[in-house]
Curated annotation (Swiss-Prot):
This is Putative methylesterase 14, chloroplastic. InterPro entries: AB_hydrolase_1 (IPR000073), AB_hydrolase_fold (IPR029058), MES/HNL (IPR045889). It comes from the Eukaryota. Its EC number is 3.1.1.-. The gene is MES14. Residues 1-76 form a transit peptide. Residues 1-29, 60-80 are annotated as: Disordered. Its main location: plastid. The keyword Transit peptide applies. It comes from Arabidopsis thaliana (Mouse-ear cress). Putative methylesterase.
Length: 348
């Protein structure tokens, strides 16, 4: 494994951010927009630093390093809204609660722009930290099954009022968790949205989706330099974590500099067991769920070809595409992702 990753070169060829004359005067709404985004980012960064400090006691592999090689300039298209009045869609929607489920190594913190924009639209976003992720201080080396890993999501769904339904949104390997949840609670889930995610089929492992990029699971377990041996080198590996340069090239090739810095101090090792577990899905439960897929077209972690293969082999109800997005559209294309989430929510 690794030839594709190790040879990965980071692209920073982006448009600058606007000419001088147009930027001389910024109207009041634009200033407020940028100030609001700055405040949100500072809060997220502060929480991430606090998390990193706490996690040192539980997880020795947590990194506190902050940095980025991105030269991307800030533009007015980056913020979570465009300065115009955001329509309130809540009146026309029956299901208003979104449950946002992060992918491998991430935590609830990664959704901060989506939370802000969905709330502005009159909706009710909820985020979860899966077991061993974000502020959930479980040692990732002890998380061995998808059931354990997804427990915070399952607990949330179990505790919903009897008649309440939610829209699930899963990013990357969070797709396996929302698939598992859809199998468990099809009656509680109005729609499931897979954002460049592992929309697995019955009997498939979440890791299998990445096999074209990472090699076969068997080869990865034997040869990968990213494995973590939480129980000792003489025992099977318990997790994995890419090195910082690899993460930047794989996940964040179009993301803003500040969001890369946030991710670099916030991401945690990925428990290996849940990624290698074959997911059991039935036509009677999972198969009755309404699934939608969001493809990211400048994705280096899960290539557009692989995403296209996923939707061919396990067809969802609808497919949406985001041009110019890396593997983290909540950072690189938040407005586009927000628009798609609203569009899917409004589908009868």
């Amino acid at each position: 494994m690794g030839n594709k990753i190790i040879s990965m070169m980071k692209k920073d060829s982006k448009d600058g951010g606007g000419g001088g004359s147009k930027s001389k005067r910024m109207n009041r709404s634009q200033r407020k927009l940028l100030a609001d985004e700055e405040m949100l980012h500072r809060r997220a960064l502060s929480m991430a630093i606090h998390q990193a400090q706490l996690s040192q006691r539980f997880d020795g592999s947590m990194s506190r390093r902050v940095g980025s090689t991105s030269t991307r300039k800030r533009t007015l298209s980056d913020p979570f809204s465009n300065g115009k009045q955001v329509p309130d869609f809540s009146e026309s929607l029956i299901v208003k609660k979104f449950v946002l489920v992060h992918g491998e190594g991430f935590g609830a913190w990664c959704w901060y722009k989506m939370v802000a924009s969905l709330e502005e639209s009159g909706l009710s976003p909820v985020t979860v930290d899966l077991t061993g992720c974000g502020f959930n201080m479980t040692d990732t080396n002890t998380v061995s099954t998808l059931e354990e890993y997804s427990k915070p999501l399952i607990d949330l769904l179990e505790n919903l009022p009897e008649e309440e339904k939610v829209i699930l949104v899963g990013h990357s390997t969070g797709g396996a968790s929302i698939s598992y949840a859809l199998e468990r609670f099809p009656e509680k889930i109005s729609k499931a949205i897979f954002v460049c995610a592992t929309m697995v089929s019955d009997g498939q492992r979440p890791f299998d989706v990445f096999s074209e990029e990472l090699g076969s699971a068997e080869r990865f377990m034997k040869e990968s330099q990213f494995l973590i041996y939480g129980n000792g080198k003489d025992k099977p590996p318990t997790g994995f974590m890419f090195e910082k340069p690899h993460m930047k090239g794989l996940y964040f090739n179009q993301s803003p500099n500040k969001d890369i810095a946030l991710a670099m101090i916030s991401m945690r090792p990925v428990p290996l067991g849940p990624m290698m577990e074959k997911v059991s899905l039935t036509a009677e439960r999972y198969g009755k769920g309404r699934r939608f897929y969001v493809q990211t077209l400048d994705d280096r972690a899960l290539s557009p070809d692989v995403q296209e293969k996923l939707v061919r082999e396990n067809s969802p109800e609808g497919v949406f595409k985001i041009k110019g997005s890396d593997h983290c559209p909540f950072f690189s294309k938040p407005q586009s992702l927000h628009k798609i989430l609203l569009e899917i929510a409004q589908i009868p």
